[in-house]
């Protein structure tokens, strides 16, 4: 009887253990975000960014304020993610402003950036995601970012500079050329094999990569994996390097599922790891190497989410645009993997029969009406519209009234360029005159007053495009110096009154003494 009882108890315990295990698996599976949930996280990040640029939920994402950042880190990763999320939005104005900013950089320095090749690579990816062509940029389509940023990347002296940023330049160069499987042109300074070899040769002895030193850096290791992923199944040395890197990342993962850089858990590092795992097709929710104490990297990333939908770079921290954009890219990578689409940086069409995006639509009767309706006095709010119309015009061979449209649009562009130049100069001169702020004195009053007069000469709309810090500091400096001047004038006035009183007293005393010294007259 006892034996039967013990057997029953044993069977019951096994069943309970089995059921408990089943509950654990169900809970873990239930924590996997759905495609819709991932889209909601991404949308919340985008809405937070819109609010930062003064847009309401019903406004377009690409308003004039945001488009002023096109060509910067903050201005390119959001459009890239929007494109990779396949969100319906107008891309023409972003491409037009970005192309114009690139042309301005080339006209000024002859290059996009003389020291950072990764500037080219980021813009290449953003342009592709938005439906543009990074090999034909500009009104005359003469700028080739692949040529100048990868194949023949040199600094102003003509020295090869793809590796000037260390392994980072090679990593992002590889991501750029593999985004559409571009082939190196004849006579290229760098080839695909050369770049790949540079990345592999930078691997650390224990696995992984770093910009410097001998300790693997989570972000750089994750990005290297992203770049090497396309070669994993065709080259054994690449597969081995990736496997070592994955093991290293697993070792570096924090106990709560997150990842740290410089001893601090942060959103950027965990985002890069998630992108790397998705690029390899590794499920971050079930792969035991990347689940610590029941927490996944995704769980850790979501701890940085704020109530307004944005993300901080440290738990309990404030909103951080860089952390938000990296999280947005990670969420996009997860969304694409869950939907069976190409990985984040593979920008070839998901459907081979898909109609390619057209960067700029035709300049038609509606475009002509828009052109003729432009006001005489323009502001930077009109810049995206003017540039879009110009690029539409350049992309359309036969346009009725082309000369009229060109005259109006080129004149409008010249007016807008003059505003941009004045804002850039004003910003630069404010920095030169006002800082260090504590050293300001009345000798600077004339310069500060002149700067303020230029600020006042701007339209209210254009003033909004001056950085908040420059505008605030200019107003503060003016108020501070006016207060000092007022105090000085009051002090001088009081001093003058005192002096006049003293002179009056002295004169009066001397007058009385003279009167006392005069002899009395005889009568």
Residue ranges and their predicted role:
Residues 19-33, 509-510:
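Sec-dependent signal peptide cleavage junction
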């Amino acid at each position: 009887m006892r034996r039967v009882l013990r057997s029953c108890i044993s069977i019951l315990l096994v069943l309970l253990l089995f059921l408990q295990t089943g509950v654990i698996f169900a809970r873990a599976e239930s924590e996997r975000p759905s495609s819709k949930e991932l889209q909601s996280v991404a949308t919340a990040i985008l809405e937070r960014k819109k609010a930062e640029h003064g847009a309401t939920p019903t406004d377009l994402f690409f308003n004039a304020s945001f488009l002023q950042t096109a060509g910067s880190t903050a201005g390119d990763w959001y459009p890239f993610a929007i494109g990779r999320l396949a969100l319906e939005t107008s891309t023409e104005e972003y491409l037009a402003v970005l192309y114009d900013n690139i042309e301005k950089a080339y006209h000024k320095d002859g290059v996009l950036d003389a020291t950072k090749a990764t500037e080219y690579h980021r813009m290449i990816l953003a342009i592709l995601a938005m439906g543009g062509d990074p090999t034909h940029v500009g009104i005359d389509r003469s700028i080739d970012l692949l040529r100048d940023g990868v194949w023949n990347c040199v600094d102003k002296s003509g020295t090869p500079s793809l590796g000037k940023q260390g392994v980072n330049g090679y990593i992002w160069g590889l991501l750029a050329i593999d985004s559409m499987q571009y082939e190196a042109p004849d006579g290229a300074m760098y080839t695909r094999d050369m770049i790949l070899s540079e990345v592999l040769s930078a691997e650390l002895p224990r696995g992984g990569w770093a910009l410097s030193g001998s300790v693997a850096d989570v972000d750089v290791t994750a990005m290297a994996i992203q770049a090497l992923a396309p070669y994993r199944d065709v080259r054994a040395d690449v597969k081995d390097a990736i496997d070592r890197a994955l093991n290293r990342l697993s070792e570096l993962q924090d106990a709560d599922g997150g990842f740290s850089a410089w001893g601090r858990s942060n959103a950027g590092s965990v985002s890069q790891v998630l992108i790397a795992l998705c690029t390899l097709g590794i499920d971050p929710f079930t792969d035991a190497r990347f689940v610590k104490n029941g927490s996944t990297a995704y769980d850790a990333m979501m701890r940085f989410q704020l109530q307004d939908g944005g993300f901080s770079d440290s738990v309990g921290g404030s909103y951080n645009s860089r952390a938000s954009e990296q999280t947005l890219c990670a969420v996009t990578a997860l969304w694409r993997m869950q939907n069976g689409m190409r990985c984040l940086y593979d920008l070839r069409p998901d459907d081979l029969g898909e109609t390619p995006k057209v960067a700029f639509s035709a300049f038609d009767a509606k475009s002509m009406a828009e052109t003729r309706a432009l006001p005489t006095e323009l502001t930077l709010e009109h810049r995206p519209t003017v540039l879009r119309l110009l690029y539409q015009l350049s992309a359309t061979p036969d346009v009725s009234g082309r000369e009229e449209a060109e005259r109006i649009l080129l004149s409008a562009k010249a007016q807008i360029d003059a505003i941009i130049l004045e804002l850039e100069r004003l910003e630069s001169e404010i920095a030169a005159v006002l800082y260090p702020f504590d050293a300001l004195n009345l000798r600077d009053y004339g310069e500060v007053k002149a700067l303020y007069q230029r600020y006042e000469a701007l339209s209210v709309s254009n003033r909004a495009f001056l950085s908040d810090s420059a505008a605030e500091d200019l107003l503060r400096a003016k108020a501070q110096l006016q207060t000092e001047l007022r105090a000085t004038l009051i002090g001088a006035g009081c001093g003058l009154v005192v002096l006049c009183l003293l002179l009056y007293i002295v004169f009066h005393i001397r007058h009385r003494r003279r009167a006392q010294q005069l002899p009395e007259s005889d009568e």
